[in-house]
């Protein structure tokens, strides 16, 4: 969970073994990561291991955002969780490690892959959660 400055410092001393991944909180409501960290990670080929990829606290899930999520859910015939996970992996060098507390949830999480949100759907979600 490094900031860009911390990651740069670590990279300066880790010349023999480059940093290849970093686990960070990353979900639909991660504008700081989108603006600051993601571009740096992509430029330096560092994989983001998205922790908390299903976490969207209710205070951030406004009626407008919920409506947009429901629209994308209907368009894709997927659940909100699947849409949220797929949105994360629509970014270059991002993988997810979603929490699961049941077999049903694990199966749902697994089916978040093998398909893609359209570029228009990704943009719609980006704009809604910016």
Which residues fall in each region the model found?
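Beta/alpha (TIM)-barrel catalytic core signal, keyed to glycine-rich beta->alpha loops juxtaposed to Asp/Glu
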Residues: 1-130
């Amino acid at each position: 969970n490094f900031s860009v400055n911390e990651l740069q410092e670590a990279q300066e001393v880790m010349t023999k073994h480059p940093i290849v991944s970093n686990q960070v909180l990353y979900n639909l409501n991660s504008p700081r990561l989108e603006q600051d960290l993601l571009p740096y990670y992509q430029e330096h080929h560092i994989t983001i291991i998205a922790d908390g990829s299903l976490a969207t606290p209710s205070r951030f899930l406004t009626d407008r955002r919920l409506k947009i999520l429901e629209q994308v859910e209907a368009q894709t015939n997927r659940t909100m969780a699947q849409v949220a996970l797929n949105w994360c992996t629509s970014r270059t060098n991002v993988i997810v490690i979603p929490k699961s507390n049941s077999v049903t949830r694990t199966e749902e999480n697994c089916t978040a892959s093998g398909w893609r949100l359209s570029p228009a759907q990704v943009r719609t979600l980006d704009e809604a959660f910016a």
